[in-house]
């Protein structure tokens, strides 16, 4: 979610043009992603975890999040395609986590976030027309 927020805000900043509906839609999606990040953080803390913004690999290594995690093309169409791919990757990741997590409450939150991500894809595809 941190990558999504940063990517959407970066894209919005680079294409912003006052009343531009494209930029407004991207900033709206970024706000939804912020809510996802907040809810996930809240769940992690409630379940006794720590928030550290690192990626944890299967071999135990950790890597701190950096802007290198982003895909930021120069052309608007490429931006939107990268955003769609990021949303699809997020959905796949949430679905994989739901298979590992046996807590119905947590899985309901993840399922709700997936619905938002699916809606973001619909919005992004509409912007490409």
PLM features per residue range, with description:
Residues 2-129:
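Non-heme di-metal
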């Amino acid at each position: 979610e941190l990558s999504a927020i940063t990517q959407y805000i970066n894209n919005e900043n680079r294409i912003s043009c006052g009343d531009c509906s494209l930029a407004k839609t991207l900033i709206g999606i970024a706000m939804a992603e912020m809510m996802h990040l907040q809810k996930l953080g809240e769940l992690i803390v409630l379940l006794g975890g720590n928030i550290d913004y690192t990626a944890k690999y299967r071999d135990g290594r950790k890597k701190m999040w950096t802007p290198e995690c982003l895909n930021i093309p120069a052309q608007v169409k490429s931006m939107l395609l990268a955003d769609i791919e990021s949303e699809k990757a997020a959905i796949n990741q949430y679905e994989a986590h739901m298979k590992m997590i046996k807590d119905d409450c947590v899985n309901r939150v993840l399922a709700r976030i997936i619905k938002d991500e699916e809606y973001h894809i619909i919005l992004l595809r509409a912007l490409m027309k």
